[in-house]
Design a protein with these regions (language model features):
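Acidic, histidine-bearing metal-coordination/catalytic regions of metal-dependent phosphoesterases
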Residues: 1-48, 246, 251-254
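Core catalytic region of metal-dependent phosphoesterases/phosphodiesterases
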Residues: 10, 36-46, 52, 57-154
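Short, motif-level signal for alpha-helix interfacial/capping segments enriched in acidic residues
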Residues: 30-38, 63-66, 182-192
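Structural motif
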Residues: 47-49, 80, 157-159, 201, ...
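Active-site-proximal beta-strand elements of phosphoester/diester hydrolases
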Residues: 48-56, 157-170, 218-223
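Active-site environment of divalent metal-dependent phosphoester hydrolases
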Residues: 56-60, 88-92, 122-133, 167-170, ...
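Conserved beta-sheet core of the metallophosphoesterase superfamily
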Residues: 137-148, 176-254
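Short strand-coil-strand connectors
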Residues: 153-156, 215
Length: 254
């Protein structure tokens, strides 16, 4: 075989490997254990719900939207708050913010004080959120951990919640794809490859691009923090009225 052919084959192998390492959802048919739907946790819920993601809390930066979140939760009579991953910017930040013993600051940061609300947490990207193995060192209260993926049963509708890092392991690539090429196409692809029924909704984070696709029943919460020159903060969430079966993008004023 000619050296040029070997070089081309080598380049193709490297390209395919890098593609699969970033877009890991395409490994699900080969490695089913990677598919978070295999061990999805079912949770019964009732009432209006707010989904937010990608707050990327940092120990050296005060979160500016506590009052805005509290106002939305209170004014819309939200029963459930679901944080769809990447609550922290890094496990180190998580330890510095909520790693001390005693009362967790999470309720204060998220504006939950004085509200009759259930709060839940979906595991985000490993470079950002602490793993479930670190439960003993990071006090997530009052957030209830639901693992890497959850099925929320509202009776009127089913909502799958997954952060979305298998759509694109490098968040910047996923952001650029959704922003410049085809919005919510990664979300639609993940839903199909993961085997989620067409009738179910899926709520994501990760790309920092808010959006709702009613036809395919996928939605993204959007992000809260700027990342270098590319990622701009949307400061949005998704409000769900299960009685109406509808999602709405809500924006938070500082």
């Amino acid at each position: 075989m000619y050296p040029v052919a070997l070089v081309i084959i080598g380049i193709l192998i490297v390209a395919v490997t890098l593609f699969l390492l970033n877009f890991r959802l395409f490994l699900y048919p080969i490695l089913p254990s990677l598919n978070p739907m295999r061990d999805v946790k079912r949770v019964s819920m009732i009432g209006p719900s707010l989904f937010i993601s990608d707050l990327h809390l940092r120990a050296d930066r005060t979160f500016q939207y506590t009052k805005a979140i509290h106002h939305i939760l209170e004014s819309r009579h939200v029963s459930n708050l679901i944080v769809v991953g990447d609550l922290f910017d890094s496990p180190k930040d998580a330890l510095q913010i909520a790693g001390h013993s005693g009362v967790s600051p999470i309720a204060d940061i998220l504006g939950l004080q004085g509200l009759p609300i259930n709060a839940y947490f979906i595991q985000g990207s490993p470079p950002h959120d602490p793993s479930s193995k670190e439960d003993g060192t990071v006090n997530m209260a009052p957030l209830v951990r639901l693992g890497r993926c959850a099925l929320l049963d509202f009776k009127e509708m089913i909502v799958i919640v997954y952060h979305g890092h298998d759509m694109s392991w490098k968040g910047a690539i996923g952001h650029a794809w959704d922003r410049f090429i085809s919005q919510l196409s990664l979300e639609r692809t993940w839903k199909r490859v993961a085997g989620v029924p067409d009738s179910d909704w899926v709520v994501f984070g990760h790309t920092h691009i808010p959006g709702i696709d009613v036809k395919h029943r996928v939605a993204n919460c959007g992000g809260w923090q700027p990342v270098r020159f590319l990622v701009h903060p949307a400061c949005t969430g998704l409000f769900l009225s299960p009685e109406n079966g509808s999602f709405e993008i809500v924006r938070f004023a500082q």
